[in-house]
């Protein structure tokens, strides 16, 4: 990372930024102060890779924060941001839920398709 930074190939994002066309990162906070989610423009709409902003589907769907977090109000704001950015709840991908492998179409061992 140090070399990439000196080569000006590393970009720190504190907010929102398009990484490549159709893929953006958005700071949401909550779980950690710098927690980010990723949005991906897809044929089905905008998907949100929630990472630790929603560890499990239940966190997002029922607005139940994960038990380890930095900022509780920030976690609820993150849920709101996820809901606003995703085209539908079906396009929200939590960070650690094994149900992802059941809810989405499997295309390989541990690989799913939106």
Predicted regions and their residues:
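Active-site glycine- and acidic-residue-rich loops that bind
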Residues: 24-36
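Cap/insert and terminal regions of metallo-dependent hydrolase folds
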Residues: 35-114
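Metallo-beta-lactamase
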Residues: 1-27, 74-89
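Residue-level detector of flexible, active-site-proximal loop/helix-junction positions
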Residues: 17, 32, 99
């Amino acid at each position: 990372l140090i070399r990439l930074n000196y080569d000006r190939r590393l970009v720190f994002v504190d907010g929102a930024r398009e990484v490549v066309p159709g893929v953006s990162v958005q700071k949401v906070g909550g779980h950690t102060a710098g927690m980010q989610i990723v949005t991906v423009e897809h044929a089905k709409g905008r998907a949100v890779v929630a990472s630790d902003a929603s560890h499990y589907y239940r966190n997002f769907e029922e607005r139940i924060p994960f038990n380890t977090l930095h900022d509780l109000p920030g976690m609820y704001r993150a849920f709101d941001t996820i809901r606003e950015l995703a085209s539908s709840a079906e396009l929200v991908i939590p960070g650690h839920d094994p149900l992802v492998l059941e809810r989405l179409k499997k295309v390989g061992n541990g690989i799913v398709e939106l």
